[in-house]
Design a protein with these regions (language model features):
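A structural signal for the principal folded core domain
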Residues: 1-217
């Protein structure tokens, strides 16, 4: 690490949302991939092709982070197709996943735009309840430990206080603009990239970022 952390609040007791706004795009993909990973676990390796075939017929392609998950567009497609999960999981096992994803979809409509819907609190609370019901179902019925990822944690614990303070939806704090710059940055970084174990790795990364930024002026 060649630069200190940029986030160093004087008061460590302040709400995390006052320092880092909830990342709208990553929350969306995080919740959906949480469900996606659970579906994969429920089906098992021997039924992986069943999931892939079900996905292909619904325009879902696995090409997310490190090639194991769903990116933004495919997350939306999986969210839309989740109503059909009973086809591969059965009605009983699919029900709590479908319920959670349906309620998350309502949350995105209520909270992820610039303006909050009047009943956003009720919609968000209903989603939070569905998360705990899914965790409980996995533990009791499936004997699966469904861990809470940091994105699920943010969605359950930190989004509501942030929205109550700002009285606005998450759109104005979306990281999507920065995400869309990945390709342009990648072109510059390819010229200077070093293996992470190379002693010049950090220096070259900083140089690449500086060169890219200087070209934007």
């Amino acid at each position: 690490m060649i630069r200190p952390c940029l986030i160093n609040p004087d008061d460590l007791n302040i709400p995390i949302g006052d320092v880092i706004p909830p990342p709208q795009l990553h929350l969306h993909t995080g919740i959906v991939n949480w469900a996606w990973d659970l579906v994969k676990k429920m089906l098992g390796e021997d039924q992986h092709n069943v999931l892939l075939n079900w996905s292909r017929t619904r325009s879902i392609t696995v090409r997310g982070y490190q090639g194991t998950g769903l990116d933004g567009g495919n997350s939306k497609n999986f969210l839309k197709a989740s109503k059909d999960l009973h086809i591969i999981l059965g009605e009983k096992n699919a029900a709590p996943i479908k319920d959670m994803l349906h309620k998350f979809d309502l949350v995105t409509k209520a909270c992820f735009s610039r303006d909050l819907l009047p009943d956003w609190r009720m919609i968000l609370d209903s989603f939070v309840t569905s998360v705990w019901e899914l965790v409980s179902f996995c533990k009791i019925e499936l004997k699966i430990k469904l861990s809470i990822t940091w994105k699920v944690h943010i969605m359950v614990c930190h989004v509501r206080p942030f929205l109550e303070k700002t009285n606005m939806g998450l759109a104005d704090w979306s990281e999507q603009t920065g995400e869309s710059a990945h390709h342009k940055v990648e072109v510059e970084m390819k010229r200077l990239r070093r293996d992470i174990n190379n002693p010049l790795h950090g220096e070259k990364m900083l140089s690449g970022c500086s060169r890219f930024n200087s070209k934007q002026f």
